[in-house]
């Protein structure tokens, strides 16, 4: 089978449908947490957070597309080890994901918002840091330009994005890993497709240019991830 990696795929993932039974979504979220733990996805988000902290010991952080809250949990536990006080907000348009996040949260106070992130306003209580993880590849380029501008306008200290590098080795590796080790039909279908919906460095550079954003940093991270970040503080 020939795979075209020259441009992003816009084929919809199963998880983007509205008729998926929630038990299947729950299984999908559990496996994604395992994948992020073992393949370094959470470590990349921690790296993004560390860059933007700039020595502060009290931080407000918001994740858009938070799912079941696994990424926020990883960041909170890291902050606790570093004696950093962290206030978290998770936003997701899927009410079932918000319910799971609330159910599984054991790490102190958190605010969970069931909404499309585009409809959320913070007023004077802006989060210091806004981030997303494996969220951007669900959107078109036009939608991502809006998303970048939204993050730029609503974060107080900066923002970061953790998402997939579209690469042949990444595609084949996740296809075989999920074929043999996943029990979720959603993960088996969506994980390889997610890579095809991922990005190259040049595409991120163009998206940032279209959004009118200067001073951001694009870093390649193992395993086949991009960490895009912008600090509003002088470095």
Task: Name each model-derived stretch.
Residues 1-30:
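N-terminal, positively charged/glycine-rich alpha-helical extensions of SAM-dependent methyltransferases
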Residues 22-48, 52:
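Class I SAM-dependent methyltransferase Rossmann-like catalytic core
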Residues 62, 68-71, 75-119:
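Class I SAM-dependent methyltransferase SAM/SAH-binding core
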Residues 131:
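A conserved beta-strand element that flanks and buttresses the S-adenosyl-L-methionine
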Residues 139-151:
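A short, conserved alpha-helix within the catalytic core of class I
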Residues 156-164:
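Conserved beta-strand signature within the Rossmann-like core of class I S-adenosyl-L-methionine
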Residues 164-211, 217:
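C-terminal alpha-helical "lid/dimerization" subdomain adjacent to the S-adenosyl-L-methionine
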Residues 215-224:
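Conserved S-adenosyl-L-methionine
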């Amino acid at each position: 089978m020939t795979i075209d990696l020259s441009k992003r795929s816009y084929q919809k993932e199963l998880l983007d449908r509205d008729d998926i039974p929630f038990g299947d979504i729950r299984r999908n979220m559990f496996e994604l947490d395992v994948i992020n733990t073992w393949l370094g996805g959470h470590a990349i988000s921690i790296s993004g957070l560390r860059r933007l902290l700039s020595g502060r010991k009290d931080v407000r952080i918001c994740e858009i597309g938070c799912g079941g809250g696994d990424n926020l949990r990883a960041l909170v536990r890291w902050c606790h080890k570093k004696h950093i006080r962290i206030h978290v907000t998770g936003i997701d348009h899927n009410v079932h994901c918000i319910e799971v996040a609330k159910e599984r949260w054991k790490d102190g106070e958190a605010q969970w918002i069931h909404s499309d992130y585009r409809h959320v306003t913070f007023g004077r209580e802006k989060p210091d840091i806004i981030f997303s993880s494996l969220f951007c590849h669900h959107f078109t380029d036009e939608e991502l330009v809006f998303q970048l501008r939204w993050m730029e306008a609503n974060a107080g200290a900066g923002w970061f994005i953790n998402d997939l590098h579209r690469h042949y080795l990444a595609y084949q590796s996740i296809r075989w890993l999920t074929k043999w080790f996943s029990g979720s039909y959603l993960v088996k279908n969506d994980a390889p497709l997610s890579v095809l919906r991922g990005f190259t460095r040049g595409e991120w550079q163009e998206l940032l240019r279209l959004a009118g954003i200067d001073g951001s940093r694009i870093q390649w991270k193992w395993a086949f991830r991009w960490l895009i970040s912008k600090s509003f503080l002088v470095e």
